[in-house]
Amino acid sequence: MKNNFYFKKNKCNIYIKPTTKSEVVSQILYGERFSIISKRNKWIKIKTIYDNYTGFIKNDKFIKNFKPSHKISKLKSQIFKKIHNKFIPINKFIYFASRITLRKQNANFIEFEKDKWIKKKDVKNINHSEKKFIKIFKLFLKTKYLWGGKSCDGIDCSALIQIYFYYNNLFFPRDTKDQIKYCKKISKLSYKSGNIIFWKGHVGICLKN
């Protein structure tokens, strides 16, 4: 596709208007695919390919030629620099469900970008599926609530549900109002483990029958 780009920072806010003073409606993660709707000075209006979400991000840090082969399976993965054959941690991370390309690897580390390495145990093949939903949701225990957030630095309730599906390469809407329309309604008496439950302004997951 001609208008087909991939985000190349660990994450950034998606704003409703081209200013950091406007509302944050969501975030975009490393390796996430999007198209550019328009450009405005230092900003671009984008539409994410996964869920058709629109908003503004800064006009930097994206690429065209990118074929993700793996994804981050840890809540956040420490980034390392390789100096004289030693791996030195730096104060940067890449977050759960981010898509990456494997450039080089050794027994314990993989290089996903030039001179940026992460631990091999922190990634899975891009086609890996985690059927145990509770395993993913437990990763985010004690994560603070953040409107528009999509990572362990802060996440909102609808993003928490969506991130499970995104990790598993399955579609699910970003916002609660759209999630309600997308889901099949069931009786309260029929709640089972794994059911998605909506109430005023929020969404959650049923852990037990």
Language-model features: locations:
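...with weaker cross-activation on analogous glycine-rich loops/strands in unrelated enzymes
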Residues: 170-209
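Boundary regions of SH3-family modules and the immediately adjacent low-complexity/disordered segments
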Residues: 1-3, 19, 26, 30-35, ...
